[in-house]
Regions:
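Long, low-complexity, charge-biased intrinsically disordered regions
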Residues: 1-331
Length: 331
């Protein structure tokens, strides 16, 4: 099979299986040209860094323009679903205005098309090598005297016998406080990898309004843990062997320390459910949670409106580099 539901399937020069929505994006750009009688202007980021489209006060679009706007958003949403997670935050933000979009919102959506036209070589490569985390410290805490006791993972009893090579899950998580300045809602951004292959991505406004970064990052960590548990059981039911623990990385050290230390306290009862959900997963050994610098966190791609220079060094090895990603870092 070489094409299915908008995805091209092929192998690159080193025989790595690749998935890329190139034909689908080409068709999107053709429809764009038919609609607006011009090609989109090339840009290197979906939306300008730090932009707040919710503050736009330009004129509302008429009915025909609104229908075009909704059609463009729908096309972009499918592009996200089939691999272009680099535009997901922008599409998520602009989807909020589908009911009553403005001229400024349409200009921003056109910019996303310009980004896709410029950065049209994005490809998900199925890299099956297990990532090496041997340099990470292995914390040794006794959780048995905590409120979680000797908690263990709930493993389904009706899953088939696992066969094949083992899979290691990696999760990158981030939150953007007050992403929407009108509602005060933060955005959760999560990127999931099986071995070295991106398999799922998430960018969505949080249900609650958090007043501090600590709270929004803990909500994001809790959502990531829920996803991790779901992925583990999905792979079990597919008969795929998985490692005992998943690796989760976040850039908020306070949240990481509060989650991984048994004697850590909580001063905000508002965060208590997220706090205990994450800590229980760590106490059971399902999750290993580590801190990384914010500039090295790929989840930034999914949590905020970013600039090219800010993100390229983490986006490039994920979507725009063929071969060994270590060579990409060396460059």
């Amino acid at each position: 099979i070489s094409y299915h539901l908008g995805m091209d399937f092929f192998r690159d020069e080193d025989k790595t299986l690749c998935m890329a929505p190139k034909k689908y994006i080409d068709k999107m750009l053709q429809n764009y040209e038919r609609t607006f009688k011009s090609k989109p202007q090339f840009v290197t980021s979906p939306i300008e860094k730090g932009d707040n489209p919710e503050l736009d006060t330009s004129e509302l679009l008429d009915d025909d323009q609104t229908q075009n706007y909704q059609s463009l958003i729908g096309a972009l949403q499918w592009a996200v679903s089939i691999g272009r997670f680099d535009i997901q935050t922008a599409v998520m933000s602009m989807s909020s205005f589908r009911a009553a979009p403005r001229i400024g919102h349409l200009k921003r959506v056109k910019r996303i098309f310009g980004y896709l036209a410029k950065m049209n070589e994005a490809t998900i490569r199925v890299r099956t090598e297990i990532p090496d985390y041997s340099d990470l410290p292995e914390p040794h805490y006794d959780w048995s005297r905590s409120v979680y006791g000797n908690v263990t993972e709930d493993i389904p009893l009706d899953a088939p016998k696992p066969l094949g090579k083992v899979v290691r899950f990696t999760h990158f998580v981030d939150a953007n406080l007050m992403h929407d300045v009108l509602t005060g809602k933060s955005v959760t951004g999560i990127l999931h990898l099986a071995n070295q292959t991106p398999i799922d991505w998430y960018s969505k406004k949080q249900a609650t309004v958090e007043t501090a970064t600590y709270g929004s990052e803990f909500v994001a960590a809790r959502i990531c843990v829920d996803h991790a548990v779901d992925l583990r059981n999905t792979f079990r039911y597919l008969g795929v062997p998985i490692e005992d623990s998943n690796y989760m990385f976040g850039d908020n050290k306070s949240v990481v320390d509060s989650s991984t230390t048994p004697h850590a306290g909580l001063n905000k009862r508002h965060n208590i459910l997220s706090f205990h959900r994450v800590r229980q997963a760590i106490a059971s050994g399902v999750i290993k949670f580590y801190h990384i610098p914010g500039e090295e966190n790929p989840a930034d791609i999914l949590s905020k409106h970013w600039g090219y220079s800010q993100i390229w060094h983490v986006l490039r090895p994920l979507l725009f580099w063929g071969g060994d990603t270590a060579d990409c870092i060396d460059e």
